[in-house]
Amino acid sequence: MSNEIHLFTYCLILILQLISAVSNTFILTLFYRISGLSSNKHLRLILYLTISDFLFTICELPYTIYITANWNPYVFNFDPRFMLISSIPLPAQLKISAILTISIALNRNIALIYPGVYLRINQQNYANVTAVIAVAFAVFDVILCFTFSDYEPKPGCGSAGCFVGDEFRYYWGISNTILGFIIVLLSFTIFLKLNHQKNSVLRKSSNDARFRQANRISIGILVSSLIFLTTPSIFVGVFEICGFSAFKLVGPFYAASLLFSGICNATIFIANNGDARRIMTKKTTTSFFYNNNNNNNTNLNT
């Protein structure tokens, strides 16, 4: 039964990768074509998160295709070096996504609690520094992963997580659990502040449509992260610390969680952005009338 669970996970990841690639490509195209989005300093962190989701989706494809194509109903016997190299995007994106999410949550906390300080912060520099820190931690995780990896074959192992050493899994579990708790804490303070908002200075600054839009998108992304990243990270971290490996049970489920999170982030952005909704509505309407005209012409010809 375990091998069938792995196969289901592999197929699910392939489907999610297709959806994630399309949705994040659409958002990146919007940022490129609409000057109001690219110049919106409040959305810079959202842009970086979208870029990381897109790159993860594309770079993880060789790994997903390999494990799906070489699935065996009886015994797995994957090449350890290919598994480790092709799975590099997973630990990197998990750390990047967590740090960017923490930065988004911290930024919203500052905006809600200390609006005067928030207005003095250069949002572009804040986002750029966050991106550099996130990439640095991701590189550190990848180096540790290869340092403590076991390059020996692991018959019956259906995930790259089985090839990394116990030291890295222990570190990974603790670090991701800590980051998860930070996200929970910052998110809780945001929700609490929104329910008891009495700051007249913030209400005045909140009249800015760009600020309100960034607020809605950020809160939506935090909820998505809590569901698809933080909760799994905490549970997996506890399991790893206790000596149990979830990788051996359900395969690369972390990749599925990251993809779910990326798709939800894209959906939240589109739902809260008027330009994105107008473009999608326009394309849908145009496609509908185009198909109707083709059908009418076909009926007239017959």
Spans of model-derived segments:
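Seven-transmembrane-like multi-pass membrane architecture, highlighting hydrophobic TM helices
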Residues: 1-302
